[in-house]
Amino acid sequence: MKKTTLVLGASPNENRYSNRAVIQLRSNKIPVIAYGIKPGEIADVKINLTLENWNEVDTISMYLSPKNQLSFYDFILKLNPNRVIFNPGTENPELETLLDEAGIAHERSCTLVLLSLGAY
């Protein structure tokens, strides 16, 4: 079984890349949890409006700007995923340093490109 991805910053807006990422992850049979600030669904995935202790998260796919990530630092570190993908525009050296110190892998990449190349 493939491990779960948390899309942090998911949007019900079909024009947003986070929305497309959820759809492509599901198309690739990867379990997805979506977290966002606007209610809705993306394909068959409900957008969670509250944070939970999702123990099964392997990867966080980041779609929050660096300034909006600050309030999630503790949550991300406590969740202790295997990796965090910083999609274009979400790169955050401060959080990357914290991830390094916690031994959490991270990469500046694009979830959609990784999926299209079969490199996810």
Task: Map each language-model feature to its residues.
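Short acidic low-complexity segments
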Residues: 45-55
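Conserved beta-strand elements of the Class I
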Residues: 4-6
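Mid-chain, well-packed structural core segment of small domains
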Residues: 57-93
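NAD(P)-binding Rossmann-fold cofactor-contacting core
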Residues: 15, 22-43
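Short phosphate-binding/catalytic loops that engage adenosine nucleotides
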Residues: 30, 81, 104
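A charged, well-structured terminal subsegment
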Residues: 117-120
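Rossmann-fold NAD(P)-binding glycine/threonine-rich loop
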Residues: 88-115
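Short hydrophobic segments within beta-strands
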Residues: 8-11, 35
